[in-house]
Regions:
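Positively charged, polyanion-binding regions of nucleic-acid-associated proteins
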Residues: 20-46, 154-157
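Charge-enriched amphipathic alpha-helical scaffolds
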Residues: 57-95, 188-225
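Hydrophobic, Leu/Ile/Phe/Ala-enriched alpha-helical segments that form helix-helix packing faces
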Residues: 39, 54, 58, 71-75, ...
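Short, well-structured alpha-helical segments
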Residues: 32, 36, 51, 64-72
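Extended alpha-helical interaction scaffolds used for oligomerization/partner binding
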Residues: 124-249
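Short acidic, hydrophobic short linear motifs in intrinsically disordered regions
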Residues: 44-55, 62-65
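Charged low-complexity interaction tracts in eukaryotic proteins
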Residues: 2-17, 22, 26, 68-135
Length: 252
């Protein structure tokens, strides 16, 4: 059994007290929401870029000192992200200044996937949603209700041998999570269907439709590897199917 660290909590309280000399509780909470939302949306982002996004979307801007003071507080709290400098996660890197540290999703550190995603992000432009949309991603289970997502939901619901809305939603979330991964494939959808015991009636005749729906969902879902762009959007920008991570149903 673990017990709270009184000294650690005392330090946190002192840090918050100092920050509240400059920021209201409401403005501190807004920072928290941005940290959580961008963590889920981008999975890796520099504090410098996050700082820029926040100030671009709010008329009452933050000073860099206050922003970094809050970032330092989060390093001593429990979140689904960690903040590290490049020198702390990669070899032979110069020491990072606080503003150049990375906000990294916890799952990437847990499965040691951060290096691949960090590499893929380099040199790409960033898609930044409007403030109201971006902050919806504070909820790690938020799913943008795109036409492609709704079409996949309709397919799963229509072909379920027994209706179980909760299980179908779990299946859809698993599929949506998968389309954002490095090696996304429509065959993963079949694996999830079996795993979640949805008992979909997907015969040989319906399998091409599942492949098409999966590829359309993949190509129209905002992807952290593409810094928030969808594969379709990145393909339109570059004309490069491979670099855009575009999936063509004819390839399966």
């Amino acid at each position: 059994m673990s017990f709270p660290n009184p000294d650690g909590q005392k330090k946190l309280d002192e840090m918050y007290t100092k920050l509240k000399e400059h920021l209201s509780d409401e403005r501190i909470d807004l920072l928290r929401r941005y940290f959580e939302a961008t963590n889920n949306f981008y999975q890796i982002i520099t504090l410098k870029r996050l700082f820029r996004i926040i100030n671009s979307q709010n008329s009452e801007t933050y000073t860099e000192d206050d922003f970094l003071a809050y970032a330092e507080i989060t390093r001593h709290e429990r979140h689904y992200f960690e903040i590290y400098g490049l020198d702390e996660i990669f070899e032979r890197q110069p020491e990072s200044t606080p503003i150049n540290r990375l906000l990294i999703h916890e799952s990437l550190l847990e499965y040691n996937d951060y290096a691949e995603l960090y590499s893929e992000k380099q040199g790409r432009a960033y898609y930044v949603p409007e403030k109201e949309v971006l902050l919806k991603y504070e909820d790690e289970f938020y799913c943008e209700q795109t036409p492609q997502f709704l079409a996949m939901r309709e397919f799963c619901t229509k072909n379920a041998k027994k209706s179980d809305d909760e299980v179908i939603e779990d299946l859809l979330f698993a599929i949506l999570f998968n389309v954002k991964c490095e090696h996304s494939s429509p065959f993963d959808a079949l694996e999830f269907i079996n795993k979640f015991s949805v008992q979909l009636d997907v015969n040989k005749k319906k399998f091409p439709e599942l492949i098409r729906l999966y590829c359309e969902l993949h190509n129209n879902t905002r992807n952290p590897f593409l810094n928030g762009f969808t594969p379709n959007e990145w393909l339109q920008r570059t004309g490069d199917e491979t670099d855009s991570r575009y999936l063509d149903p004819k390839d399966f």
